[in-house]
Swiss-Prot record:
Protein name, entry field: Probable kinetochore protein spc24
PANTHER family xref list: KINETOCHORE PROTEIN SPC24 (PTHR22142:SF2), PTHR22142
One Gene Ontology cellular component: Ndc80 complex
Species annotation: Emericella nidulans (strain FGSC A4 / ATCC 38163 / CBS 112.46 / NRRL 194 / M139)
Subcellular location: Nucleus; Chromosome, Centromere, Kinetochore; Cytoplasm, Cytoskeleton, Microtubule organizing center, Spindle pole body
Amino acid sequence: MLLDENPSTLIHHTIGNFNIAPDKQAVSRINDSLATLQQSRELRMREAESSLRKLSRHLQSLSTQHEEAVAAHDASKHAAAMVELDTKKFRIAKAASELEIESERLEGELEMLKERLADLEAQGLEGDEATRREREADDAILLRLKIYRALGIDIEPDEAGNFTKAVIRNSRKGDVHVVNLDPKFSRFFYANYFWSTMQG
């Protein structure tokens, strides 16, 4: 009987029915995503800075060449160098603008993930109120089914999920009784019937 069970054993079995692994995994995935986004952003920034430094050095080199061209008073080379410098300047400005836009986008994603993480932390491992209530209702049904099973009674649901059949096993006699549950009979009636069948 249920009352003969050790309370610690019942509590242990009940705790085993709680499923907090998905929430813990979700928090872990969010933390991993935040770390990955941060690393990606830092890598992009380093690549952009490296590219800008290379372009700056190249620009300096071109400037030196330009100065030498001016000193040589070669108008055609000077004009070509200026055009090339303007082109590279435009490319650098465009690259910087794209990097700034990408940085703002990544920052926006990071803020959304931080808000999501804060919501999950506020809800705790048990989830929000609606989730907790649904889990408690499911746990209560599972606990009742376990108690019935421990007594030798299997309650079977129909296609709609309603419990309409009970299989009662009398281990002392080796008998098996199948009872169709009809809503017109009270729970008290079925409790007495189940008990008498198990004891009979």
